[in-house]
């Protein structure tokens, strides 16, 4: 969720634009602030959806191996450790995440090439290769490994960061907080969970939202 420091930064950004504008339209400035915070939520959902999408791409890769005219022994007996990662499966099958993405219009439908590039890069990533190579399993180990792959590869993938700069002026500044929220969400997944609980943009008592409106 948004913290006070991040809120102050957003407010200062909007106020700078407000005082640069000769008309100094308060209503428009408030809308800009609301838009900025909503983009933060969209980025958070996009990051979780990116992680969830990795499972489908991994499954596609395994199925493509089976269909080769001359499949290798690895193609015929693939390592399924990643696709059966339990926290990843919870994310991939999450109704809460799917509903939130649909309601906000967030998704990767128009960015499939980038998504595949992130996945292919992950296959060469040290964290992924170490995870696939060792025999250790267990829910906590799977969850910690997924977080490391996300933090050290997915969110830092160069083409992904380039996309953020092109898509929204807010996302580059929001990335660190959105990524920490995504990691916190993954860490809340417990063994036996059938769905993931998404973090709210504001605290339950709504103090932060009132704080933002009061400062502005």
PLM segments and residue spans:
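Class I Rossmann-like S-adenosyl-L-methionine
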Residues: 1-216
